[in-house]
Amino acid sequence: MKRSAFFISDGTGITAETLGQSLLAQFENITFNKFTRPYIDSVEKARAMVQQINNAADKDDVRPIIFDTIVNQDIREILATSNGFMIDIFSTFLAPLEQELSSHSSYSVGKSHSIGHNSNYMERIEAVNFALDNDDGARTHYYDKADIILVGVSRCGKTPTCLYMAMQFGIRAANYPLTEDDMERLQLPPALKQHREKLFGLTIDPDRLTAIRHERKPNSRYSSYAQCEFEVREVESLFRRENIPNINSTHFSVEEISAKVLVEKGVERRFK
């Protein structure tokens, strides 16, 4: 079964898309054609949006699912004339909150993602720069400033996890790829020993690692199953020997890996 889904906002669309994606992910038996439409902030754009929704309804022969965070009442009323199933995120959650808090909400566009009034903005940028500067073991002499250091074989998900933690939570995350030389020594590299309390390991199923590496360097020793299986086995042995907490990243998203890492290490998010 296939349905169209629209994430519509008069701002960036981040809130509508994030919540909408999370809800749709619960329906694994349905394939969704997803469309994000930010900055629908005028009557003209709203009318054009209605036409897009109606076209999708005609094409699919079933009404699309609409997630919106539209603040302007006139625009919301126009969208409501479409042949879509509307889920007004703000109204759904703000009305009961207003009642509970005995206060009216501001209904401001882009409030949650404002840069000018967000004291976390510079901290976020600094964390991202730190993750980039300390990617792939590039600058180990700055590890004393890291909140956490991810270790594991090449291509097991360290870099995207570090960047996600930096972007979302302001975490200063570095990562270090364990190589064959490190495995042959049967101990942690010198650069990591003095920061043992910050280490967290990522491992991965060998067949998944083989597929990922094959996309980068096909038909090479680096991407062979034998090499991947050897590296994973040796790194997992090192984790056990050095008592490094770790998780298998194979079946988890970057968001899930990040959350598990922070909980396991007890690292507090700089902002939420």
Swiss-Prot record:
It comes from the Bacteria. Pfam families: Kinase-PPPase. Disulfide bonds: none annotated. ADP binds at G152, V153, S154, R155, C156, G157, K158, T159. It catalyses: [pyruvate, water dikinase] + ADP = [pyruvate, water dikinase]-phosphate + AMP + H(+); [pyruvate, water dikinase]-phosphate + phosphate + H(+) = [pyruvate, water dikinase] + diphosphate. It is an enzyme of class 2 (transferase). Keywords: Kinase, Nucleotide-binding, Serine/threonine-protein kinase, Transferase. Its EC number is 2.7.11.33, 2.7.4.28. One of its GO terms (molecular function) is phosphotransferase activity, phosphate group as acceptor. The keyword Zinc-finger does not apply. NCBIfam families: PRK05339.1. Belongs to the pyruvate, phosphate/water dikinase regulatory protein family. PSRP subfamily. Bifunctional serine/threonine kinase and phosphorylase involved in the regulation of the phosphoenolpyruvate synthase (PEPS) by catalyzing its phosphorylation/dephosphorylation. This is Putative phosphoenolpyruvate synthase regulatory protein.
